[in-house]
C-alpha cells in the first residue's frame, strides 16, 4: 500500500511531529529513509527524565545523551527539560528561543555540587538567541550563562538550594522579570534584582509574609537606582488580610524608597475602594518616594484606581 503520509511536504510532517511527545517523535527515525533525520528539524523538544530512561534504556539519564539530543536539532526553538538528575549538562543551541528548566538535581560526591572552573558539574547555557528563560525548582548556584543574550524575559518559580547561593549569573540585557517571593526566601528579592542591572519592569507575586529585615539588610540593587520604571506587586490571598496588606506595603516601601522613577501597581484582591484609599494613605507616608503613578485595584474584577503625581507630589485620582 502506498505511503501517503510520507509524500506530504517536510513542513507539514515537522508540524505533525511537533504535536507528538518527543519520545514518539524520535521513534519515527526507524521509518523509511525520509523520516530518519526528520525529527531533528522539529522546532520543539519536551524532555522528561522518565521518558528518556525508556528511550535510551539507561538506569539514569546520560549527560551525553541529553546534550546530543539538544545539539543535533539544528532548528530547535523551544526546549523544556523536566525531572532530570545529571552531573553536567550544556544546553548549546544557536536557534533556541525558549528554555524551561524544572526540577533539576545535580549529582555528585555527597550531593554537594557547585559549578567550578573545570566545568565538570552543573549546567551551562550557551544560547545566544534565547528570548525566554523559565526556572522552577532549580539550584541556581549550579548554572552559568556563557553566551551573550541580547534580549531575554525570565521567570523564576520555587527555586531551591538558597543556603549556598551568593549571587546569580548576571543578565545584563534582562529588562523584565516575573518572580515569586516566598516568606522563607525573602533574601532572594535583592539577589534577583542585583543580577539584572538594567531591569526596567518587575512583576512580583508575594507568597506568605516577606521578612523585610532580610531584604533591607542587603545592598540596594543597581537597577532600582538607575533603570526600574514599572513595578507590579500582587499578594496571594491570605486569611489574615491585615497582615497581608502590611507585607505588601512594606515591600512597596522598600522599592519606592530606592527607585528613581517608577510606575507602581498593587493588586488588592477582594478589596473595596475605601481599602484602596487606605493603602494609598500608607504609601504616601513613605519617605523619599519618587513614583509618578500608582494603580491600586482588584485583579479579578479589573477594578482599578489611578493616582498620578506631579512634581510637587500632589496627586489626582481617576478610574482606569
Curated annotation (Swiss-Prot):
All copies of domain FBD, residue ranges: 212-268
Stretches assigned to the F-box domain: 2-48
Record-linked SMART domains: FBD (SM00579)
Source organism, top-level taxon: Eukaryota
Protein name (record): Putative FBD-associated F-box protein At3g60710
InterPro entries attached to this UniProt entry: F-box-like_dom_sf, F-box_AtFBL13-like, F-box_dom, FBD, FBL13/AtMIF1-like
Organism of this sequence: Arabidopsis thaliana
Amino acid at each position: 500500500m502506498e505511503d501517503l503520509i510520507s509524500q506530504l511536504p517536510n513542513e507539514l510532517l515537522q508540524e505533525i511531529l511537533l504535536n507528538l511527545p518527543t519520545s514518539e517523535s524520535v521513534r519515527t527515525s526507524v521509518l523509511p529513509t525520509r523520516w530518519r533525520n526528520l525529527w531533528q528539524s522539529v522546532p520543539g523538544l519536551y524532555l522528561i527524565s522518565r521518558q528518556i530512561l525508556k528511550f535510551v534504556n539507561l538506569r539514569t539519564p546520560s549527560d551525553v545523551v541529553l546534550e546530543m539530543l539538544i545539539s543535533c536539532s539544528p532548528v530547535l526553538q523551544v526546549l523544556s527539560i523536566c525531572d532530570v538528575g545529571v552531573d553536567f549538562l550544556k544546553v548549546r543551541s544557536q536557534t533556541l528561543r525558549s528554555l524551561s528548566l524544572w526540577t533539576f538535581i545535580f549529582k555528585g560526591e555527597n550531593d554537594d555540587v557547585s559549578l567550578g572552573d573545570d566545568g565538570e558539574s552543573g549546567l551551562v547555557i550557551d544560547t545566544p538567541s534565547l528570548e525566554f528563560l523559565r526556572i522552577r525548582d532549580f539550584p541556581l548556584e549550579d548554572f552559568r550563562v556563557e553566551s551573550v543574550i541580547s534580549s531575554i524575559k525570565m521567570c523564576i518559580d520555587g527555586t531551591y538550594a538558597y543556603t549556598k547561593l551568593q549571587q546569580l549569573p548576571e543578565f545584563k540585557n534582562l529588562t523584565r522579570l516575573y518572580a515569586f517571593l516566598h516568606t522563607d526566601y525573602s533574601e532572594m528579592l535583592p539577589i534577583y534584582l542585583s543580577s539584572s542591572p538594567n531591569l526596567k519592569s518587575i512583576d512580583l507575586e508575594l507568597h506568605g509574609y516577606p521578612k523585610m529585615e532580610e531584604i533591607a539588610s542587603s545592598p540596594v540593587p543597581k537597577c532600582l537606582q538607575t533603570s526600574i520604571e514599572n513595578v507590579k506587586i500582587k499578594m496571594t490571598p491570605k486569611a489574615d488580610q491585615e497582615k497581608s496588606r502590611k507585607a505588601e506595603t512594606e515591600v512597596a516601601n522598600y522599592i519606592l524608597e530606592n527607585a528613581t522613577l517608577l510606575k507602581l501597581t498593587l493588586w488588592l484582591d477582594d478589596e473595596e475602594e475605601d481599602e484602596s484609599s487606605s493603602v494609598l494613605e500608607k504609601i504616601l507616608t513613605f519617605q523619599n518616594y519618587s513614583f509618578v503613578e500608582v494603580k491600586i485595584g482588584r485583579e479579578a474584577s479589573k477594578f482599578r484606581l489611578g493616582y498620578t503625581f506631579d512634581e510637587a507630589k500632589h496627586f489626582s485620582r481617576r478610574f482606569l
